[in-house]
């Protein structure tokens, strides 16, 4: 059902158009300008301790926390030996791989919420990375500020298929800053795809008054319906 709707988003002007003469090699982080979904584990046994937390920078500068322009320190992986890329690689396990995707899982102390780094291979020389959080039956994806990287339209389509077919997710949530200039275009684009605006107070999203959330719910046939 997602595949039948993907063409609407593939041609959307919200995604950067492909340019001729692309650079021969590029690995693009789609969320690089708005880092990143983060997992904060707190003490106690309440449900709050395992809830996904969407904080885009550890030390925000002036301006909204959601998309601060201040430099962001590299993510420190719990249990790692520093903030280097080497530590990041050592603290991640291969989660899934095929001819289009390579997905690694960051090791965390929280066994209820998983951080997945999704790298889609558009060509041999061009790849796009998305950092997502899988919590329960929901996958959370942050839409970065500004024009998305070239090729992100195809990359996002593959990501949705992965969420449905491999993760068997019940919901996919996207989030972006409310005050961004292309907010109306994003709402229109993802509404065409089947996403719906999430009202404040929804139990599956964090309390972020500065952020807009949209949700896509996968419709699955029950075993009883299949027998009929």
From Swiss-Prot:
Q: Which GO terms describe its molecular function?
A: ornithine decarboxylase inhibitor activity
Is Transport one of the keywords?
Answer: yes
Q: Which GO terms describe its cellular component?
A: cytoplasm; cytosol; nucleus
Mind telling me which Pfam families this protein's record contains?
Answer: ODC_AZ
Biased composition, class Low complexity, residue ranges: 36-55
The UniProt entry, under SUPFAM superfamilies, shows:
Acyl-CoA N-acyltransferases (Nat) (SSF55729)
| The keyword Signal belongs to this UniProt entry's keyword annotation | no
Q: Which UniProt keywords apply?
A: Polyamine biosynthesis, Transport
Query: Its induction, per UniProt?
Result: Induced by a ribosomal frameshifting mechanism in response to increased levels of intracellular polyamines.
Q: What interactions and quaternary structure are annotated?
A: Interacts with ODC1 and thereby sterically blocks ODC homodimerization. Forms a ternary complex with PSMB4 and OAZ1 before PSMB4 is incorporated into the 20S proteasome. Interacts with AZIN2; this interaction disrupts the interaction between the antizyme and ODC1. Interacts with FAM171A1.
Family that this chain belongs to: Belongs to the ODC antizyme family.
Function in brief: Ornithine decarboxylase (ODC) antizyme protein that negatively regulates ODC activity and intracellular polyamine biosynthesis and uptake in response to increased intracellular polyamine levels. Binds to ODC monomers, inhibiting the assembly of the functional ODC homodimer, and targets the monomers for ubiquitin-independent proteolytic destruction by the 26S proteasome. Triggers ODC degradation by inducing the exposure of a cryptic proteasome-interacting surface of ODC. Stabilizes AZIN2 by interfering with its ubiquitination.
**Name of the protein in its database record:** Ornithine decarboxylase antizyme 1
Q: Which organism is it from?
A: Homo sapiens
């Amino acid at each position: 059902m997602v595949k039948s709707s993907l063409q609407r988003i593939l041609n959307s002007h919200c995604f950067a158009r492909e340019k001729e003469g692309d650079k021969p090699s590029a690995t693009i982080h789609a969320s690089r300008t708005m880092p990143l979904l983060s997992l904060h584990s707190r003490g106690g046994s309440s449900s709050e301790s395992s809830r996904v937390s969407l904080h885009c920078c550890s030390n925000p500068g002036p301006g909204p926390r959601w998309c601060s322009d201040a430099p962001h320190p590299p993510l420190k992986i719990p249990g790692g030996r520093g903030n280097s890329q080497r530590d990041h690689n050592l603290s991640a396990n291969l989660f899934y791989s095929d001819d289009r995707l390579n997905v690694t899982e960051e090791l965390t102390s929280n066994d209820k919420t998983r951080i997945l780094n999704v790298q889609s291979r558009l060509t041999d020389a061009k790849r796009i990375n998305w950092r997502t959080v899988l919590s329960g039956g929901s996958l959370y994806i942050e839409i970065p500020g500004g024009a998305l990287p070239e090729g992100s339209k195809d990359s996002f389509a593959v990501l949705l298929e992965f969420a449905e077919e491999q993760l068997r997710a019940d919901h996919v949530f996207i989030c972006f800053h409310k005050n961004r200039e292309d907010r109306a275009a994003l709402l229109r684009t993802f509404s065409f795809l089947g996403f719906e605006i999430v009202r404040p107070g929804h139990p599956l999203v964090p309390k972020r008054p500065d952020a807009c959330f949209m949700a896509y719910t996968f419709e699955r046939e029950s075993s009883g319906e299949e027998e009929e």
